[in-house]
């Protein structure tokens, strides 16, 4: 069976690949949206911390024999703690300044992190095997579904939904959102706003690290792997709407699928289709698809 001259298995394979990439886009843009929406900081270090999550996973297994499933928890925790240190020692001084200062500061953090790991490991890829439980594939009849890629999509959707629910539907999320609008009012309810801000940044970068762990068996691990991802992720955030949690999730997944299908029908445009969509969206709706017009 063919669709527009393309065999169905080939199209479904690219659709799945698009969903996997879209899962990474959604996870990373979600972390960026949390940080920008609640802290008003453009976190350019997100790509480097995504890379660091993958590198820590490789180091944990290579040097200590720590399995993938343990690193799925330990790596985000470690990067989250690093995020707390970054927020307390650097970012806290630029909250009242222009966005450009936050962008430049986090760019500097990116260059330091990438430079250190490039000096130690070089730029060649570090292999990381798929965990035994998720090796192989499942034959669905109409296509062969790689087990690990299916896991990436399911795990990403679960984390994205849990994050959206926490921020939009719980009392904690209400405090977080109110803290960005009127911190003094929130403090009057006994909430430690500076601590809340610190933990928010830590949580946002932990999401990037979680995506890095998921990516380790799929993308060759290298100190520069975040660079190839972060520009596209920023485009996703702009299209979805800066600071929009739901926009980041839906747009990330949607653009991943569009990118995957573009590779089937017009491969030459697959590297630019996301940015073409970004330009068109900004012309029609400058605040993004899910953003609020000011």
Q: What are these language model-derived features?
A:
Residues 16, 38-85, 89:
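Membrane-embedded helix boundary and interhelical linker motif in transport proteins
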Residues 54-58, 76-82, 107-117, 155-164, ...:
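Hydrophobic core segments of alpha-helical transmembrane domains in multi-pass membrane transport
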Residues 10, 89, 120, 181-188, ...:
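Cytosolic-side transmembrane-helix boundaries in multi-pass membrane proteins
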Residues 93-169, 196-199, 220, 261, ...:
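Transmembrane helix-bundle core of multi-pass membrane transporters
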Residues 65-109, 116, 250-251, 255, ...:
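Alpha-helical transmembrane segments within multi-pass membrane transporters and channels
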Residues 25, 29, 65-77, 201-208, ...:
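Transmembrane alpha-helical segments in multi-pass inner-membrane proteins
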Residues 1-27, 56, 67-71, 97-101, ...:
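Membrane-interfacial amphipathic/re-entrant helices at transmembrane-helix boundaries
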Residues 21, 143-221, 245-251:
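Helix-loop-helix "hairpin" substructures at the membrane interface of multi-pass membrane proteins
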